[in-house]
Amino acid sequence: NKYFKKNNPVYDFWLDGLTIDVKYSSLYKRKNGNSHHWQLRTKGNQDFIVAFLERESGSELEEPNILLIPMQFIEEQKELHISQSGRWINDFQVEPEELQPLLKDYALLRKNGLF
């Protein structure tokens, strides 16, 4: 196990100095059907989490909600609860075409010592 951890970093991608962990979550519904949410594990030392959230139950990666979350905004949590109208969706949701340019902008900030 010691060697496994050493050879397999806790992030999925490295982009120009940024470490990125990619996550996916199905849409969870409460038994009463009134509440929907997603769950993500946030453990790790990555710079960002890119989360793909199932838009409708059963739709999987068909037009998912996408979140770009800098780890500085996550406090020592191991699980992140994301509601459909909560802070995480409102503050960190990005459109698919915005994801790559935003990551490149952050990589440039890192290169210039500003992040």
Give a label for each model feature:
Residues 1-115:
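Nucleic-acid endonuclease domains
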